[in-house]
Amino acid sequence: MQKKARKTRRQLLASKAAVQQQLINKANALTNPLETLDKFHEYITTDYTIKLSCIRAKDAQPECLSWIFDIMERNMKDMYEQSTWGWDAAEKQAELTEEMAWYLIASCNDKFLGFSHFRFDIDNGDVVLYCYELQLESEIRRKGLGRFMMSALESMAYQNQMLKIVLTVFKRNLSAIQFFYTLG
């Protein structure tokens, strides 16, 4: 009788990494990760009927990119300047338009109201949907849109077999900490 060869730790890790990369590649090969999630195409408040769309950052129209950079600077420049990272507009633009970046965009009547910048990635050995940004215009905050967008991201993560959503929040951004804490 022949003994079955046991895989070494290195072989097991290589096999796991290959499976993870296949999941990331499959998620990134999608045209629109939101497409089959019908309940996340529209969000209705008392004042707005908001459409959600999902596109690759590299496919975003110039007016969309311009608005994204503008809202990032309006909402986050001070936080970055107060951190050890500092604010570097060119570096932020490069991050926001990186090859693997996706946008979840909320708009109403051709007006941009919010966006999330995210990627399907590997973080600390896990396949994740990494939420780099969630930014809303001030007039739409505290109306449930941020929660709705995070639910859409969670559903996209689940649909694509990502283990979790990962994000980073500045310690000084108390409202964001409270928001994400309430989401669990």
Where are the regions that the model predicts?
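Conserved beta-strand-loop-alpha-helix junction that forms the acyl-donor binding cleft
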Residues: 134, 167-177
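Polytopic endomembrane small-metabolite transporters, centered on the Drug/Metabolite Transporter
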Residues: 80-82, 160, 171
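Acetyl-CoA-dependent GNAT
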Residues: 20, 26, 39, 43, ...
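Conserved acetyl-CoA-binding loop-helix of GNAT-fold acetyltransferases
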Residues: 142-155, 178-182
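Conserved GNAT acetyl-CoA-binding A-motif
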Residues: 157-168
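Acyl-donor-binding surface of acyltransferase catalytic domains
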Residues: 1-51
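Active-site acidic-Proline motif in GNAT/NAT acetyltransferases
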Residues: 137-143, 171-172
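Structural motif
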Residues: 160, 182-184
